[in-house]
């Protein structure tokens, strides 16, 4: 069911009202406590600015890191408040907690169009426990609720699900709306041919996605460490490459299912192997039938890149989730980089390209083509679960349109 969004709220609906907005400000920091990538903060700006312009009192809440229910000084949201103030061009009131009298006092002082940021939700264990009393306390300082944290929408926490029982309306922000539009339509109503590129090291973490995509897509391209489980299932020798021994039968059944459904399932034909898992290891490119004993595959080879590029050439929609190799090591990043450039070209020709969260986002950013993609998902696990066709609790809890 479509959900009510912030776009459905008029100025009259929110002016002078206290609006609790769940955002995802779980941003990376360096050792000195500086934000190294503010993408997630910038992603929430359209929703925040819309509420400011409509005269709302904006109360932002987010988790940061994994403090496990206690106050950890290095996990305070102070650096985030500072960066957000710079981006908005106005002071953001930083609260010293997310519930309680001090928060009520700070919120009561807000003028229309002002913004407050509550302290890290996960300083309270009740947040992840979706505790009703904590949800009620969180909701007590607000009149209505907006969820714009797609990255945590697959979790039923107090700030994503619990508060919706006490605040009405509860609606989706612009970021969640965009995520749903792209990810759901890519699966339910794509321009064809639809290709999915699935990478990463483990078949086990991508089983659900591969199974769902086999029902929906025309071509499925598989790269990353999981290819060796498929090769071993075919009876090939894979040296010291990563293999999930308990998933060999599954790999066979996925290949069988693809051919039964008429889905073109492509695996690399050559790989870059190394004699150690190391950025400076000795490396060579070999055909998949010729992986030497004691060596491990860490990237797809140039022939495979060409094979994948040819398969993608006529595609109108492409979903990419997971790198082709160990792209953190420059020596083994070529396959992943080539796919990123290929998608850039396809987008330029009118294809819809969706980067489905996690490491593939880091990859397109590293290559510098992130802004050339149709859509970059901000959720890792949430994107995967949505692509798997699962119901996300944080979305299900919102009002229906």
Curated annotation (Swiss-Prot):
Pathway: Carbohydrate degradation; glycolysis; pyruvate from D-glyceraldehyde 3-phosphate: step 2/5. It comes from the Bacteria. Coiled coil: none annotated. It catalyses: (2R)-3-phosphoglycerate + ATP = (2R)-3-phospho-glyceroyl phosphate + ADP. The keyword ATP-binding applies. Substrate binds at residues 24-26, 40, 63-66, 122, 155. Its main location: cytoplasm. It is found in: Cytoplasm. Keywords: ATP-binding, Cytoplasm, Glycolysis, Kinase, Nucleotide-binding, Transferase. GO terms for biological process: gluconeogenesis; glycolytic process. Its EC number is 2.7.2.3. GO terms for cellular component: cytosol. ATP binds at residues 206, 297, 328, 357-360. It holds the Pfam family PGK. One of its GO terms (molecular function) is ADP binding. Belongs to the phosphoglycerate kinase family. HAMAP family: Phosphoglyc_kinase. Monomer. This is Phosphoglycerate kinase. It comes from Gloeothece citriformis (strain PCC 7424). The gene is pgk.
């Amino acid at each position: 069911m479509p959900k009510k969004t912030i776009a459905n709220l008029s100025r009259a609906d929110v002016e002078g009202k206290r609006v609790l907005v769940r955002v995802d400000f779980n941003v990376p920091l360096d050792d000195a406590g500086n934000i190294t990538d503010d993408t997630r903060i910038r992603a929430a700006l359209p929703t925040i600015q819309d509420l400011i312009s409509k005269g709302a009192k904006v109360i932002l809440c987010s988790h940061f890191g994994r403090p496990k229910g206690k106050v950890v000084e290095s996990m305070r949201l102070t650096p985030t408040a500072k960066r957000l103030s710079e981006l908005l061009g106005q002071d953001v009131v930083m609260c010293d907690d997310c519930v309680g009298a001090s928060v009520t006092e700070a919120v009561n002082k807000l003028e229309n169009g002002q913004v407050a940021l509550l302290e890290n939700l996960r300083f309270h264990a009740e947040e992840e426990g979706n505790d009703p009393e904590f949800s009620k306390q969180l909701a007590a300082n607000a009149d209505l609720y907006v969820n714009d944290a797609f990255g945590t929408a697959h979790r039923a926490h107090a700030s994503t699900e619990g508060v919706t029982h006490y605040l009405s309306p509860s609606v989706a922000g612009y970021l969640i709306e965009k995520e749903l539009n792209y990810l759901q339509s890519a699966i339910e109503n794509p321009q064809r041919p639809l290709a999915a590129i699935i990478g990463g090291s483990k078949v086990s973490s991508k089983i659900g996605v591969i199974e769902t995509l086999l029902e929906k897509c025309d071509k499925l391209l598989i790269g990353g460490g999981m290819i060796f489980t498929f090769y071993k299932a075919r009876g090939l020798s894979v040296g010291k490459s990563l293999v999930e021994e308990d998933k060999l039968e599954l790999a066979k059944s996925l290949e069988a299912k693809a051919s039964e459904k008429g889905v073109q399932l492509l695996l690399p034909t050559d790989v870059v192997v190394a004699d150690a898992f190391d950025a400076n290891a000795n490396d060579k490119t070999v055909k998949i039938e010729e992986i030497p004993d004691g060596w491990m595959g860490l990237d797809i080879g140039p022939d495979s890149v060409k094979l994948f590029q040819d398969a993608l050439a006529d595609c109108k929609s492409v979903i990419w989730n997971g790198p082709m190799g160990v792209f953190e090591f420059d020596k083994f990043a070529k396959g992943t980089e080539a796919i990123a450039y290929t998608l850039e070209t396809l987008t330029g020709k009118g294809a819809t390209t969706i980067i489905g969260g996690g490491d593939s986002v880091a990859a397109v950013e590293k290559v510098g083509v992130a802004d050339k993609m149709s859509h970059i998902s901000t959720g890792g696990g949430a994107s995967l679960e949505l692509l798997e066709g699962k119901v996300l609790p944080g979305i299900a809890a919102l009002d229906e349109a």
